[in-house]
Amino acid sequence: LAWIGSQTSKINLGTSIMQISARTPTSAAMTAVTLDYLSNGRLKLGIGVSGPQVVEGWYGQPYPKPLARTREWIEIFRRVVAREEPVEFDGEHYQLPLQGGMGLGKPLKLILHPVRSRIPLYLGAEGPKNVALGAELCEGWIPMLISPYRMDIYKDSLAHRPPDFDIAATVTVIVDDDLDRALARVKAFVGFYIGGMGAKSFNVHKDLVSRQGFGEAADKIQELFMAGRRDEAFAAVPDELADELSLCGSKDRIRDRLQAWKESPVTMLNVGTPDRDTLRFLAEELL
């Protein structure tokens, strides 16, 4: 992002979703303020709590009360970036200065003066309570595996969002006149998240797909994937689901299906494609 920021002057710089267990809120704030300074105020920081398999298995941290931990993390991040005074915080998950230890910790604040006192935060979330937390505390929400036709499942979560709240949906886009071939690629992605990106007893991606009306298929996908039958798991992803979660097919078809996204609460598309021509095509349609 620092390199992209140095080569551009207008576009915003988004991080996608940084797992909050990977960085303390003070460390994340220092990095964000530096990037925002170098880009003259163009950073949008995406954050997310991840899941227990990653948090406990990779970062070696406990995973209790993720909503409360996220709330505390955001509060500290905001205070550091605001740079109004040395930061003191006494929470359940974070304490600044640390209680105990050598007893030498003291409240501190940034040396660098931010170009903005508030850097936009976008919360990656799938659970209804987590989405509601994002609508309360953040400038935006980054959903994935969401259908523009079924976003009413978040009606209550988004009921009190501010008028300028951003919803930046992650959408795979594949321009291909062979629709079945395009959807097969989407099915592999969706099937991997439903089947493998979480434990059998705790998988927020599977839960989200189930809440959108594909519970029976989600159960089958997870069962096949965990049995080592990945190809069968991917094939078990319904065409309807893969199609709704993506933009696939000819340019004319994609152009038609873009209308559903435009009519939904989504305000921005995070386009997933390695193809520059596809990005250019979508820019012409959306901008």
Predicted regions and their residues:
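Active-site-adjacent structural elements that line small-molecule/cofactor binding pockets in enzymes
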Residues: 1-287
